[in-house]
Design a protein with these regions (language model features):
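Acidic, metal-coordinating helix/loop segments flanking the phosphotransfer/catalytic sites
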Residues: 33-51
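Alpha4 helix (beta4-alpha4-beta5 surface) of REC/receiver domains from two-component response regulators
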Residues: 65, 87-117
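Conserved acidic carboxylate
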Residues: 11
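Non-catalytic signal-transmission and effector/linker regions of two-component phosphorelay proteins
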Residues: 1-8, 112-137
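Active-site residues of response regulator receiver
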Residues: 55
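Charged docking surfaces used in two-component/phosphorelay signaling
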Residues: 18-22
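Residue-level signal for the "D+5" position in two-component response regulator receiver
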Residues: 33, 58-61
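Acidic catalytic/metal-coordinating carboxylates
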Residues: 36, 62-68
Length: 137
C-alpha cells in the first residue's frame, strides 16, 4: 500500500481539532482528523498517512496503545509519529523507546505556524509565500 502525502490528526477534542484543521489546511497541509483510536486505526490501515499527530488520551484506545500496535506492523510501523498531548513528556518516558515516535509536543506550548513549518519540512512540501509572509509580519 502506498503512503499518502497527508497528515492524520488523532484527537477527541473537536474544538482543538477544528483549530488545527483550519490553520494547517490553510497552509496547504493535507490534514485528516480521527476522533477515536478505532477510527484512527482504521484510517491508518486503509490510507497510510505520511505523518501522524496523536494525543495520548482518547475515549476508546489510548495513544500509547495505538503507537505500540502500529510499531508491530511493517507498514504502519514506518509512519513517523508525533505525540501532541497535555501530559508532559517527563511523565511518559516510554516514548523515547518507541521506534516510530519522533517528536513530543506539549499541547499548551504548540505554536501552529511553527508546527506547520515543521510538518512541511518533514513531508518535503514547498513553503508558500503565505506561510513566510505570516511569520515575517
Amino acid at each position: 500500500m502506498t503512503r499518502e502525502r497527508r497528515v492524520l490528526l488523532i484527537d477527541d477534542d473537536q474544538d482543538l481539532a477544528d483549530l488545527y484543521l483550519k490553520h494547517l489546511r490553510r497552509d496547504g497541509i493535507p490534514l485528516e482528523h480521527a476522533r477515536t483510536g478505532q477510527e484512527a486505526d482504521t484510517f491508518v490501515r486503509n490510507r497510510v498517512p505520511a505523518l501522524i499527530l496523536v494525543d495520548l488520551t482518547l475515549p476508546d484506545l489510548d495513544g500509547r496503545e495505538l503507537i505500540e500496535r502500529w510499531a508491530d506492523d511493517s507498514v504502519s510501523g514506518a509512519i513517523p509519529i508525533w505525540i501532541v498531548s497535555n501530559i508532559t513528556p517527563e511523565d511518559n518516558l516510554w516514548w523515547h523507546t518507541a521506534p516510530n515516535v519522533q517528536r513530543y509536543f506539549l499541547k499548551s506550548k504548540v505554536v501552529l505556524s511553527r508546527l506547520s513549518l515543521e510538518i512541511r519540512a518533514t513531508l518535503g512540501l514547498p513553503y508558500g509565500d503565505r506561510v513566510s509572509h505570516r511569520l515575517a509580519g
